[in-house]
């Protein structure tokens, strides 16, 4: 360290406190990175890697970015999961002896971003904190850009569903704990010392933050794990933000039982937030329903989809509001136009509180507040009864508007310092400084004209740069006419630059005025933000009301465009959907092309539907559309059907498709069985089960046996009786309906004509005993030879008696037992009571006997 420069010592002292972050070290007009940070920055940001001498014989890797381009480069690093420590100069050159003082003013991580251009407008940016035990979990989340702060305590089995629903950008855990993330989720994992998760420490942190004596008012006193997670989250935010967290003024405590539950597989299988094919918004349910016009509405829609309601009265309130907008097309159209002019008031309110909002954004806020007044005149003065519940927070804020109008210019720049942010007349002293700066500019223009005339040098010009200040520039060709009082300041290739005593005097005057102007404008702007901060709660209330109106009117717009209907809820444990449709598939096919289907499920008479039929005929679509209609109804949306009579569903489970969990060392079949076990162990009589091809991941007989046992279990367990759609390629399962009274068979209708097969996509009663797999293979484009040979093999398998061996070179003969001898196998066959066997049991017995015969060499 003896040969290290003071600047490097300063950097190393700061860097040691942020070993996991890239340190952006402010040096004048640049943020510099050093050593390994520089190598990472150069690689990820595609900037030049150079070096700087920072001690005797010591050259250190260096890569820098201009300070004004920070947000652009910052977003690229954060999106790749890096953390960045912003180290600023906190004193001015000359104010202190030696180096300018520097300190980290903020640690930017994926879960603590607040800059508008780094955030997804219609998606929350959640930081998630977890504290795990063997069978339970404390969970807390916060979005500091919107002031949301919540927590819960749940069993470990429901954790993955909550993580998928929240889709956090960053997760914090104690150092001694680990977590397997859902396969689709890309979140940064940050580790905290376990000390911050200790119950007493975390509780004290929360009490201090909320300035209260206990947590009973928040409803989490009996959630020790949730308290641990929430307290640790607060600590992490304080460490990263280096500022007050006053915007987190409420803690929303909830339980997963408050809402319909869907695990991560269900969210993925039903394509709620993203399509399975392109992993994008297009093709998802969110993509269909999101006709929202505001950022707040878009985020609220995501919340609705992740937490369908279980309280019928709350659902009916939403449906009644959708009714209003469905019927009142002029009101819906007018509102949509107004909402399109509303900025992200929720995030703006928080940036006002944090004093990070830009002057130009205040004009956008002003325009939004004017639109709020117009919307209030339309709906708030005489609220339509069906909207009244959602209009409570909608109130004009004329005082806030007045403050912005009186203090901020109509077209302010993004930054402070030029005297163009604060409106003239607001502060007399600042007006004087602005006038002085303006007069100086006029003086310099006049001086340039005067010096040209005095010297006769027509090309003479006055200029300014940050290094040399103000100067007079004369080309080399005119240096002979230069007056003697000009003092040389800089030599260029084709010109020389000079100063004069008069110019230097005005330079000092102007620079002092600009410095004072920056200080004064900054101070006045902060005063304005303090005043606007007094409207924080009212601004958030308006944002919440507008978000609700946005989502509910969007539901109506989607319903009108796609001919959806209002669902009806009843207390019986049944659902009855007439001409139901799959919302995403229908849109992909185009209007009128989708084949609608009915479904009736009831705990009393049709609890389980066994659905058979060929692949690609529409089984999965039918299963999924039923679940989607139930979900849509419980978020308060109209549904794609002719009629829909539903009961409240507490959970939707789906077991669809095949996938491996390589990270856990689990095969496709093991994953299938784990998911099936979870469903059977947690479903209730009010659940909806969507089971597709259970048992296909193992041998035919094992799979068939498991599939049958699962159906029998769902049917026979008194505490279960969940409404179930069970699609299968095991045609033998249709026999279950003969002795399980609440099992019904349905199949996909198929038309055959002269060897051509047409899938009608219509669900009809009854089972099928024929597969059309080869036809599907033909549609997929397999070679004609393969298709022809497959039909030959199929014929042989279906008619074994007619099968003729291709070669008869060696035909071993069976050794028949001698007269009077009886084998054990024969005795077992004789003892069979064939009349009491079901077809499926007989098939299983035949398989068993065949296996024994092979073992005996028969």
UniProtKB/Swiss-Prot annotation:
GO molecular function: ATP binding; ATP-dependent DNA damage sensor activity; damaged DNA binding; mismatched DNA binding
PROSITE patterns found in the cross-reference section: DNA_MISMATCH_REPAIR_2 (PS00486)
NCBIfam families found in the cross-reference section: mutS1, PRK05399.1
SUPFAM superfamilies: DNA repair protein MutS, domain I, DNA repair protein MutS, domain II, DNA repair protein MutS, domain III, P-loop containing nucleoside triphosphate hydrolases
Gene behind this protein: mutS
GO cellular component assignments: cytosol
List of residues binding ATP: 613-620
Signal sequence, renumbered to the chain: none
Top-level taxonomic group: Bacteria
Family the entry assigns: Belongs to the DNA mismatch repair MutS family.
Function: This protein is involved in the repair of mismatches in DNA. It is possible that it carries out the mismatch recognition step. This protein has a weak ATPase activity.
SMART domains: MUTSac, MUTSd
Entries under InterPro entries matching the protein: DNA_mismatch_repair_MutS (IPR005748), DNA_mismatch_repair_MutS-lik_N (IPR007695), DNA_mismatch_repair_MutS/MSH (IPR017261), DNA_mismatch_repair_MutS_C (IPR000432), DNA_mismatch_repair_MutS_clamp (IPR007861), DNA_mismatch_repair_MutS_core (IPR007696), DNA_mismatch_repair_MutS_N (IPR016151), DNA_mismatch_repair_MutS_sf (IPR036187)
One BP annotation, GO: mismatch repair
UniProt entry keywords in alphabetical sequence: ATP-binding, DNA damage, DNA repair, DNA-binding, Nucleotide-binding
Protein name per UniProt: DNA mismatch repair protein MutS
